[in-house]
Amino acid sequence: MLPAMQTRTATDTAWFTDARLGLFVHWGIYSLAARHEWVMTREKITNEDYRPYFDHFDPDLYDPRQWARDARAAGMQYAVITTKHHDGFCLFDSALTDYKATNTPGGRDLIRPFVEACRAEGLRVGFYYSLIDWHHPEFPVDGHHPRRDDLPFREAEAGRDMAKYRAYLHGQVRELLTNYGQVDVLWLDFSYSWRDWGWSKGKGADDWGAHELLEMVRDLQPNVLVNNRSEVRQDFFTPEQYQPRAWMHVDGAPVMWEACQTLNGSWGYDRDNLDWKSPGMLIRMLVDGVSKGGNLLLNVGPTARGEFDPRARATLAAVGSWMHHHARAVRGCTQAPADLPAPPDCRYTWNPKTGRLYVHLFAWPFRHLFLDGLAGKVAYAQFLHDGSEVRLGEYEEAGHYPTVRADAAVLAIPVQPPVGVEVPVIEVFVRR
């Protein structure tokens, strides 16, 4: 459980809960290895043996405008990119290190064009920054470090100074929030103070100087949204690779949250990973999250040459096709009122401004759909994919018709589902 620590938070969060869908990008020199972004520690690779990826990183096909167009077409409203991951390699031109994209064969800052492309396509900009750094000479070796099992190395490096690394961390965050204009999201990753390997302990808020870090962040960019992973409570929580069973609560109160999910089984480019989620599954995850008051941050791991994998682009396009017709059942929507329970195999999303209820059909019902609590309150209903009317059904409580709640509205549903619609949605105009 996270410690009960908090500092200043953002004042403008409405855009985030309105957007509901964002792009996550995990990109770095691990894309050359093409077998997971944690490859350095999974395979216990030394800095020297990891160096060829740095020496050969030349993303000659990098077109961030195309990335931004793909995200926009998928219905996404913001994009978050890894400025530095746990291996310590920086995509931005940091003055505090030589371990950066400008010193690779690619020879340029890769973050600035990403920021410009996002803004050109109307996307808000987010920066992921790893609190961990396996390359930095002062980052203390612990149980996550690639050299964790190298006892002579651990003994030789026992004097590493966390204070020096902490100053580096703070300095890089200052650079990111100073040199690229308005930043909408700061996605810090991650704390693990509860871990204990016997010979070393995990790291958390005190190690990062998180309170001081976040005070600096608020001085530089008061309205940037910051996640919870520094162990200091901020603006939103980040369930990873799972869908919460209900709206997330902390200390008994609902909080803003965003589920981050991969397209396959890896965050970074993983050539041989075949665990691709179907567009239908991803759409259901998006809807499920919105029905519980949450966002979805959907990840793509670009190739070493700077492109989205064709399978990733096809998935984004399929999500975008659905969003083209159904965006208003997602954006600006949230959990429905508690007295309106969704039918079996359905999710409700609710727009509190328009008073419209959206019924997302995860399974196709036979002929009738019963909406408890809405008898006499349905002014009109229609399918969103084509705007066709869904008529109110008629039923009797006796004879061949089932007994239903007296306060239920009944919608007459076609026997066949619409062709080519991953998740059909009925828009219900509720009488106020």
Where are the language model's segments positioned?
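Mature catalytic domains of secreted/periplasmic carbohydrate-active enzymes
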Residues: 1-432
